[in-house]
């Protein structure tokens, strides 16, 4: 049985950017960042209106193919609801196609906005576990999606494949001494474009290397930030992607040469540095700025949140 939502319901969702992989944790580790998109959705009698401010304005579709709209509709279907019409307003601060989880944020934010609508009815909103499952199914892997749902850092895993895949995540508490410095270039790149650069198989030696570093990274993130340099080494995906984003690869070399644990953020081309120092070395900052990177310190991001009505602002 499907319930049609009445017109006049309004909900707001706030969802964080995220950095996946963190070096060795390919498709497994994720970290939310304190950079947020806001979604406001209202039920109306009929039709669909989509507006976008900020990142993606004038570039993304403003119809039912918009990722936020698809996620809202999927969230409503999963709870047994349908909207007669929708007005969707997106205010985006997360850069698109840079490796900062913008698509995961769109999906998680849309699902959360649907929860905000459903919470005003007698029907039951999606649980956290359902949010992770649905958003990860959209993405095809759970690292960014789970980080956006839960906030903080996450270890994620997948059981099964295809339509039977089940996604799960466990939260990690990031050590308070760790400072996060995302560096965002003008260059864009999609995950699909860079995945084709990766080989179908890897050597046992390389697999063993990354397994040890990914395990060490969990320790470094939570208890021993002094181990971050060793823990962020990777041989499975960053070297293979370097030719497609030479400025990012060189910036990583400069940062790590200065003793800063730096990795590609997701599939790149953004870079993220994890440091116990409150500032990055001047040499690295100068290189980044000269090569078109915008560098800013961010905190660990919060998990997605939703509310009824229109938020007063950020």
From Swiss-Prot:
The lineage of its organism: Bacteria, Bacillati, Actinomycetota, Actinomycetes, Mycobacteriales. The gene is thrB. GO terms for cellular component: cytoplasm. Belongs to the GHMP kinase family. Homoserine kinase subfamily. InterPro entries: GHMP_kinase_C_dom, GHMP_kinase_C_sf, GHMP_kinase_N_dom, GHMP_knse_ATP-bd_CS, Homoserine_kinase, Ribosomal_Su5_D2-typ_SF, Ribsml_uS5_D2-typ_fold_subgr. Its main location: cytoplasm. Disulfide bonds: none annotated. GO terms for molecular function: ATP binding; homoserine kinase activity. It catalyses: L-homoserine + ATP = O-phospho-L-homoserine + ADP + H(+). This is Homoserine kinase.
